[in-house]
Amino acid sequence: MLILNGKIITWGEPAQILENQAILIRDNRIQEIAAQADLLARFPQEERIDAKDQYVMPGNICAHTHFYGAFSRGMAIPGAPAKDFPEILEKLWWPLDKSLLMEDVRSSALVCLVDAVKHGTTTLIDHHASPGAITGSLDVIAEAVEQAGVRASLC
């Protein structure tokens, strides 16, 4: 696949914004960035995507997330404010985890994955470990990750 007509952000040293360049992608990996005319000449049959003068950059990486936390967005901890992190676990996270059904695990993962894709994140590390973790939940999360078309390390 060739991505054409974009402004390519390299994030290299030094970071650059390249114009009149194209990106060759093979097997879901950037293989080459070169002059657009050169890549078009060398790969005339390659599938093409017109970036229409928009910015193109490598995907972001989220190195720590909890997909099941999607259901706690905006949720207040009941009662008095927690004194410390263990109390937050006891009052919010562990009760939430204990109440999740397998379909809830899948849905919460998909909510987070859609949000990740919308914001340019293509690789995530999800920590799905807590006292009430459902047997087989990592398999369900892995299926959601595959459906979303991103990469993830699940633990």
Language model regions located:
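Hydrophobic "anchor" residues on beta-strands that sit immediately upstream
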Residues: 1, 60, 122
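Histidine-centered catalytic micro-motifs
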Residues: 58-70, 128
